[in-house]
Amino acid sequence: MTIMSDKWIREQATKNGMIEPFVEAQRRDGCISYGLSSYGYDARVAPEFKIFTNVDSATVDPKDFASNSFVDRETDVCIIPPNSFALARTVEYFRVPRDVLVICLGKSTYARCGIIVNVTPLEPGWEGHVTLEFSNTTPLPAKIYANEGACQFLFLQGNEPCEISYADRAGKYMGQQGVTLPRL
């Protein structure tokens, strides 16, 4: 697999709608950086959050996810409680080409503050807003800034298109919009 350059990412985003909205140059003016980088794209977090809480003594079960496990917030600054977790989504909508696998890494700005961003790979043929998982590993409240950089996506091109894409098998998260909870 080959990691794809800024030139390729720009072309796919502008001609094929791979990333919408697309920010062509990295923005760093007084914010956590986002936009096109040399070999990746730094995506922004939207102002839509689901913050985990234990007010109702719920148990987190991926097979039977209880909606009372979290509170919804629309805000420019999300505060994640100590040793807690929040879900969010990217501002950008992604359309992954059939011969590409996308992996995501957290931003060092957040990592150096004990905030871990996790995203599973974006499979060939998948499209949607990416649900972001933020873990606050510290004993202190932690801030996440909406409309600023959250993570970096790296685009890996395979040696040929896959036989069966995520779209072909009608994957359960295909076309997701907004923060998407676990599905079976």
Swiss-Prot record:
Recorded catalytic activity of this chain's protein: dCTP + H2O + H(+) = dUTP + NH4(+)
GO biological processes: dUMP biosynthetic process; dUTP biosynthetic process
EC number(s) per entry: 3.5.4.13
Pathway: Pyrimidine metabolism; dUMP biosynthesis; dUMP from dCTP (dUTP route): step 1/2
Active site: E133
InterPro entries listed in its UniProt record: dCTP_deaminase (IPR011962), dUTPase-like_sf (IPR036157), dUTPase_trimeric (IPR033704)
Family according to the record: Belongs to the dCTP deaminase family.
Assembly notes: Homotrimer.
Name listed for the protein in its UniProt record: dCTP deaminase
Gene that encodes it: dcd
